[in-house]
Amino acid sequence: MKIVDQRYLGSANRYSTEPCLLSILDLGHPAPACAATMAQLRDRLAKVLPGLRRGRSLIGIVGDEVVPEEPDAPCQGLQLARLIQSVAIELHRLTGDEVMVGFVGGVPKMDGRYRLILPFRCGTVANAALTLSIALIDALLKDESFDLEAGLAQLREIAANGTPGPGPAPQPTMPIAA
């Protein structure tokens, strides 16, 4: 999982009436996890981020999507992309920002790639929250330990200081067609 493109979009844009971060997420392949793995991931996330269960976004309740009937059948990548976006919003919220909505959509003709829209007050914090979200979910999927408290402390410091965060720096604001 990685971000392959990012842009800061100005106040009035196609996706939001407020500034937002447009990121293209590449999951690596179209169906990264089975239904059982996604259920385990949601359970583990609920333990480390209890506010995530109450979180809603423009797309509905976290993970609110039809899953395959067979327990080991692959899920569509959209479910994982939505979860990454929802975790990023929750992490962003934990810095004191009131961001509560976002958008996730598939990139046409590019299986495994998703457009994530994260409204923000501070673009650097949105970028760092998304980077932390991907790292957390990647670690949980690999069953590796992850120091979320250290990540949150760094995220809060970025929010307090306005210093550049981890991850690639998005391009300057520019109109995006499509």
Task: Name what the model sees in each region.
Residues M1-A178:
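Preference for protein termini
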